[in-house]
Amino acid sequence: MNQHDEQANPGAVPRRGGTGGDAVNARGGRANHAAEMPGDFVAGPGAGHERVEPVARTREEPEMIERVLLDGSVTPMQIHRPKGKPRAIVVFFPGFGMGARYYWPMAQELRDRGFAVLVSELHGQGGQTARATRGHQWGYHEIASVDYPAAVAAARKEFQEPGERLPLYLMCHSMGGQIGSLYLARPEADVDGMITIGSGTPHYIRFTGREYTRLCWGGPVMWTVSTILGYWPAGPWDLARYGRQSGRHVREWAMFARNGRLRPTQADIDYSREMLKVTTPVLMLTCDGDRDCTPDSAMDLASRLPAAARFEFIDRRLGHNRWAREPEAVADRFELWLEELSVGGARPPR
């Protein structure tokens, strides 16, 4: 099976995803052109348990652009243009093991609300052409310092008129938010804010039950396999369904899960120290039913950005991935957050 064939049914709700990974499948390449939305969900505690009808949607093929990165790999990027002048730009990054096309309902929802949206890929996932081998590895640092700046620059080029600067916000899922937190600490970061959904630290002490066991014991297994092979393999042994992944990235994640410290290899800055200085507003969300990013996990990641990040819980049972296919609740909170920013009320408490 080659790198472009490892595609699960993108119309289905994923079996699992998480702070430890976000598996629909590592190759999110091809989607049904008219996929129905998943069924009804039951509102979470405190919401009256009312029946909520998801909005019926039909996927519209987006415009696509490509960017060649420093390693020669190519990143395809979805372009969703609103009618009229954009309110702002949103650059979206997926979770670990998830292709960008899974998120089309969220992209279209934001577009319909007047936002210009670019949806990128994480390195080596979805339509991104990098292939992890023993001799070709990347990690958190490479993605934060290469992939994220490339996507932001592409979005500004696509959506801005010459001499114009529109507000630009990152929207990141799970692993995408971990990496986004590093990007904000970099000197070239060029965004006005970041909202994350289901992003937290994978430190096993932030979890209970099956997830505690999976992270406590599964992390060392993934570290060992990725060290021996030089990459994390796809196929029958990929029980987590992350798809083929860079060995360096998996090892960095596994140590993060083990000791709560993220220390990217070959980094050109001290990310932990620089994150303490970030003041770009960050809103970190988790949804009811998300066992793979607990509130404690998200708050732990938010604490790494003490001058920038605040955490909130969405009391609707949208889990770790379902919010992306039923995007109204997150889109509503995003719009409200932008209103709060405009009046200076969205900063973390002092």
Locations of regions flagged by a protein language model:
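Active-site glycine-rich loops that stabilize anionic/oxyanionic intermediates
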Residues: 95-98
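Short alpha-helix in the alpha/beta-hydrolase fold that links the catalytic acid
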Residues: 294-303
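Catalytic active-site module of serine/aspartate enzymes centered on a nucleophile-bearing elbow/loop
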Residues: 314-350
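N-terminal cap/lid segment of alpha/beta-hydrolase-fold proteins
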Residues: 49-79
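Alpha/beta-hydrolase-fold enzymes
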Residues: 171-261
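Alpha/beta-hydrolase active-site loop
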Residues: 137-158
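Short beta-strand/loop motif that positions the catalytic acidic residue
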Residues: 278, 284-286
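Conserved alpha/beta-hydrolase
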Residues: 109-131
